[in-house]
């Protein structure tokens, strides 16, 4: 099981509760999690309920089955005080993402910043 990142991975789901999501297929112009991430691999995900103020970002595991699934393994941030969201009814957009807390980048002063923090190392 590898950690895989890919572009333009987005599906919908109508799953409720805090458990594993059943994925409903790729949104037009995007690929499925199985096509982009692969069976049994992990990826960072975001889930956004279109009808409610519910969202979650985390690390999940993709399963290729008659109905593909995304297991919500580790919640990184959410609308539920950074705990698993008990999603209400309605359509959710589910997509691969790279959480801000996992990113390293150079700021305008060439300081290397990790995550959302303001401290870093000067590489000039």
Predicted feature residues:
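A generic structural signal for short, solvent-exposed coil/turn residues
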Residues: 13-15, 37, 52, 62, ...
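Glycine-rich, low-complexity segments
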Residues: 1-30, 67, 76-121
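Ser/Thr/Gly-rich low-complexity blocks that favor extended beta-strand/coil architectures
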Residues: 34-59
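Residue-level signal for glycine
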Residues: 52-54, 110, 123
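Functionally constrained cores in energy, signaling, and assembly domains
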Residues: 43, 62, 119
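Elongated alpha-helical scaffolds
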Residues: 53-71
């Amino acid at each position: 099981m590898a950690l895989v990142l890919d572009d333009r991975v987005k599906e919908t789901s109508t799953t409720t509760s805090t458990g594993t999501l059943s994925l409903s297929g790729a949104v037009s112009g995007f690929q499925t999690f199985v096509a982009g991430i692969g069976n049994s691999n992990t990826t960072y995900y975001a889930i956004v309920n279109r009808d409610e103020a519910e969202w979650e970002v985390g690390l999940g595991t993709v399963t290729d089955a008659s109905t593909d699934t995304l297991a919500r393994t580790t919640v990184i941030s959410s609308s539920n005080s950074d705990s698993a969201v008990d999603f209400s009814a309605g359509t959710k957009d589910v997509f691969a993402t790279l959480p801000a807390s996992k990113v390293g980048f150079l700021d305008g002063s060439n300081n290397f910043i990790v995550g959302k923090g303001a401290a870093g190392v000067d590489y000039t």
